[in-house]
Amino acid sequence: RGARAAYLERCLAELCGAEAAMVVNNCAAALVLNLRHFTAKKTEVIVSRGELVQIGGGFRLSEILESSGAKLREIGATNHTTLDDYARAIGPQTGLLLKVHRSNFFMEGFVAAPERRELAALAKKKRVPFVEDLGSGVLLPAGDWAEGHHEPMPREVLKEGADIVCFSGDKLMGGPQSGIIAGKARHVQALKKHPFFRALRCDKLVLSALQSTAERYLHNQAGTLPLQRMLTADLASIQRRTRKVAKALKGMPAKICVTPGHSQVGGGALPQVPLPTVTLDIVPDDIRLNDFAARLRRATPPVIGAISGRRFRLDLRTILPDQEKPLMNAIRQSFISK
């Protein structure tokens, strides 16, 4: 029987600078599979209190860890964890040293945590597997579009000594929902042989879409992905397009203007990096804002915006140029239909 994801796995390994890679249906599944494998005999997993994050939908890392059957060993304080905290916690029942990237929040002030290389050296010395969960992983330098900001990439995590890295194939990678596991070949092969892996496998449609995404990165064509086009959109271009749409809608029974604003990246990532943008602001003359927003949601195609400051707002960063005409038609129709 052929391995349905063999070519994709080689592509992902190349992108991550890893010996091997594999795919499951989301990043939480990737973490659970690692936990079930590495804590099967030695049940404790060590993690800093400052990294016990809550992800979308109200799911908490601590609850995910416990649901896998692992025993959570919290160390350090919320804002301060040292290498000695990790060293003292490692014992005969330690199955895994886990580092979790705080991708959806940040701390500043009196904050400290050991460097990744230090954790990797400690894990190697103590012969404990070291896994890092990046959450919404990014494959290209975030500084290209978020000036002055660094977001850890799978390649650097592995280069600095982690045995395994997990991250999402959607979110900042821009592919379909999936979880990617990359790292040392012996660990990846063991994870693929774990009985629980079959319950987490992706279907062929997801694998195909992820393959297309990975190939664009490998062929230096990531800029053609919708997500990358949105992240790297030039402010001047957004302003020009927004003004063009505002001008085309002149005559509608509403106050329409272009206002400076910020785009939130979303996807559980980069909460402190709003991207400069402008918004198309609409205040209908004779329709309540909530009713106008509801009409747009029912339009063809549906249009989803935000109500803020007593205005209905659209950020054209997230609307591709070839979607501008359908957008304007939907807005015009929403002033007529009920």
Question: PLM ranges: what are they?
Answer:
Residues 198-199, 297-304, 332-338:
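A common structural junction motif
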Residues 172, 232, 312:
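Glycine-rich phosphate/diphosphate-binding loops and the adjacent beta-loop-alpha structural elements
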Residues 1-2, 222-225, 308-309:
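Short coil/turn segments at secondary-structure boundaries
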Residues 125-126, 220, 250-254, 285-287, ...:
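Short, glycine- and charge-enriched coil/turn segments that flank and shape catalytic ligand pockets
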Residues 1-217, 246, 250, 330:
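Conserved PLP-enzyme active-site core in the AAT-like
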Residues 239-322, 326-327:
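Conserved C-terminal alpha-helix-loop-beta "cap" of PLP-dependent enzymes
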Residues 206-207, 211-266:
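Conserved PLP-dependent catalytic core of the aminotransferase class-I/II
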Residues 1, 310, 327-330, 334:
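Catalytic, metal-anchored helix/loop core of enzyme active sites in primary metabolism
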